[in-house]
């Protein structure tokens, strides 16, 4: 049976895991790393993903895309702050969604995410020796409907059957609690690169029940990096009058240096940020260098506003679960940003206990997703996962009010129906406006979509009975139906936010991805053929130097070597490269045979002598 994998598609890094013998195992990528940077770069007609993409970011800031998770499933008007912080171009799409522009070509966040997924899956397939087609993909618990749908679409574009979209903290709890025997109430504190989630669960006898979840999709480790970036840029501007953030290459260097400093300050009390030749003096045109000492105390001062924002979701999750900090048995830290000592201190202050460090914060989410994949594939038994919807869902009613049908923290899957009526006499159609959020007025909440129910018989206001049903599936994705009871007329909508892709767009992107995959495969094959010919040439040259063969064979081999050199330099087509490699290997073989024959002619060439030990 084909394997299904678990994928943590992260803001800064991504991880893929699989079940081996009932235990989740993280799979290394082609570079031998367990964690793959969530970075995609477009350079000279080729697409780089992961470490290779991250490495060349400073030289190619406009063509290197990172933190794409901050843009997925969002409207352009919602991401103005995030768009200013990245060196690449973020532009509005025709649907009001987000697009990334590289050299005049527009990419959706789903396409970029699919490239990361494809890299993870292709590398894992090679590692396992079998093609992977099924996956469970994780998302922040606080992702809304549009963001979940967009993530599922990214999986489809990558050629995957997405078995389930599950919440990151829930996945982490699965990995933590799989072998636990007793009952525990745990709080998962998940601070990743770009999102923050707090989830309270009860774990016992294979049942993982989410009691409450809260969070902030605009808060993570990269916000800490940007706090350092802003400080460095301000200090440099004060000193030299140059705005480094206006230069895309300088901004990329600042971002990388800030991330490095943040990581170092988790284990040391101070670090030096050194960026030589960061800019030119506007007056003298001489190079300017940035050299700045950053202490842990200063770093904690810079991120103080972010640390304060961690408190609200923790308190909200506890309140919604009806628990006090003393009733929490374990606090599980998830996400790389939880390594920051000041973050751990906030956890201690809020919950009055030392956090549990038994899980790897970078890998535990993917491992939990692999367990859920095993559950769905029937490999893991006696595990039941009961998750919740993170935000309330409802419809707009008279006066612009949001009427809630499904309150936040309702266990999913779930179905809820309510009866509504018309506001005007002889109204023959109603518009159902579906909303997600916690504010009382419709305009203050997230609009998920609108649809019309037509053909209502003319009746006085308040007489028609319109049944509106909300259905949330196990992925947390919403389906809404409206039915007029007297006629049985029905209308429905699978909520696709205007920022998510239509089926036609998804199919177009899938086809494009397949074409690119074919191009990539051809490019790789071509490179391998060139390398094979070049390696054969090097081997042939060594044989010429080390062995003495017949003059005619030598001339043939030298000619084949010369031809190989010329074809590699000319970047010849594949058939020529293949033929030249075969020709060269044959010439080497013939030359070596001749050389062996010459060296082993028998008695005339061999001097017989007794063996005498040296004195």
UniProtKB/Swiss-Prot annotation:
Transmembrane segments: none annotated. The keyword Nucleotide-binding applies. Induction: By stress conditions e.g. heat shock. GO terms for molecular function: ATP binding; ATP-dependent protein folding chaperone; unfolded protein binding. The keyword tRNA processing does not apply. InterPro entries: ATPase_NBD (IPR043129), Chaperone_DnaK (IPR012725), Heat_shock_70_CS (IPR018181), HSP70_peptide-bd_sf (IPR029047), Hsp_70_fam (IPR013126). Residues 592-615 are annotated as: Disordered. This is Chaperone protein DnaK.
């Amino acid at each position: 049976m084909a394997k299904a994998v678990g994928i943590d598609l992260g803001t800064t890094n991504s991880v893929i895991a699989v079940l081996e013998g009932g235990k989740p195992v993280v799979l290394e990528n082609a570079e031998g790393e367990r964690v793959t940077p969530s970075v995609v770069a477009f350079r000279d007609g080729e697409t780089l993903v992961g470490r290779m993409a991250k490495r060349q970011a400073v030289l190619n800031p406009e063509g290197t895309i990172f933190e794409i998770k901050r843009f997925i499933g969002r409207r352009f008007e919602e991401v103005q702050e995030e768009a200013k912080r990245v060196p690449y171009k973020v532009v509005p799409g025709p649907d009001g969604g987000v697009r990334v522009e590289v050299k005049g070509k527009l990419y959706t966040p789903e396409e970029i995410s699919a490239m990361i997924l494809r890299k993870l899956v292709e590398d894992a397939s090679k590692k396992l020796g079998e093609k992977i087609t099924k996956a469970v993909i994780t998302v922040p618990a606080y992702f809304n409907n549009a963001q979940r749908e967009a993530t599922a679409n990214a999986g489809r574009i990558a050629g995957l059957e997405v078995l389930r979209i599950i919440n990151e903290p829930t996945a982490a709890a699965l990995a933590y609690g799989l072998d636990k025997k007793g009952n525990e109430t745990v709080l998962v504190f998940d601070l990743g690169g770009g999102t923050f989630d707090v989830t309270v669960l009860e774990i016992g006898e294979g049942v993982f029940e989410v009691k409450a979840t809260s969070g902030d999709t605009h808060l993570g480790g990269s916000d800490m990096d940007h706090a350092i970036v802003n400080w460095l840029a301000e200090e440099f501007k004060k000193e030299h009058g140059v705005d480094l953030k206006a230069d895309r290459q300088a901004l990329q260097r600042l971002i990388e240096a800030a991330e490095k400093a943040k990581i170092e300050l988790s284990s040391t009390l101070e670090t030096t940020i050194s960026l030589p030749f960061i800019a030119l003096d506007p007056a003298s045109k001489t190079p300017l260098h940035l050299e700045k000492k950053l202490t842990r105390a200063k770093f904690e001062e810079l991120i103080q506003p972010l640390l304060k924002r961690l408190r609200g979701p923790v308190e909200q999750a506890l309140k919604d679960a009806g628990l006090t900090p003393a009733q929490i048995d374990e606090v599980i830290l998830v996400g790389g940003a939880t390594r920051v000592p000041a973050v751990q201190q906030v956890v201690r202050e809020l919950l009055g206990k030392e956090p549990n460090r038994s899980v790897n914060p970078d890998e535990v989410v993917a491992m939990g997703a692999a367990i859920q994949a095993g559950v769905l594939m029937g490999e893991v038994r006696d595990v039941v996962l009961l998750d919740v919807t993170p935000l309330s869902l409802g419809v707009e009613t008279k006066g612009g009010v949001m009427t809630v049908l499904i309150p936040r923290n309702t266990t999913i899957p779930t179905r809820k129906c309510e009866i509504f009526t018309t506001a005007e006499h002889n109204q023959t159609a109603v518009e159902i406006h579906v909303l997600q959020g916690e504010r009382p007025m419709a305009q203050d909440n997230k609009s998920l979509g609108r649809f019309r129910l037509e053909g209502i018989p003319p009746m006085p206001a308040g007489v028609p009975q319109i049944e509106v049903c909300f259905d949330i599936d196990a992925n947390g994705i919403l389906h809404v139906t409206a039915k007029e009871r007297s006629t049985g007329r029905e209308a429905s909508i699978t909520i696709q936010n205007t920022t998510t892709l239509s089926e036609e767009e998804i199919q177009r992107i899938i086809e494009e991805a397949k074409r690119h995959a074919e191009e990539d495969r051809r490019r790789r094959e071509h490179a391998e053929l060139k390398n094979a010919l070049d390696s054969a040439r090097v081997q042939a040259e060594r044989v010429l130097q080390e062995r003495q063969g017949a003059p005619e064979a030598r001339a043939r081999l030298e000619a084949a070597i010369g031809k190989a050199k010329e074809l590699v330099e000319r970047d010849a087509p594949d058939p020529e490269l293949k033929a030249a490699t075969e020709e060269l290997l044959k010439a080497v073989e013939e030359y070596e045979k001749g050389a062996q024959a010459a060296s082993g002619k028998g008695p005339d060439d061999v001097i017989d002598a007794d063996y005498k030990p040296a004195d």
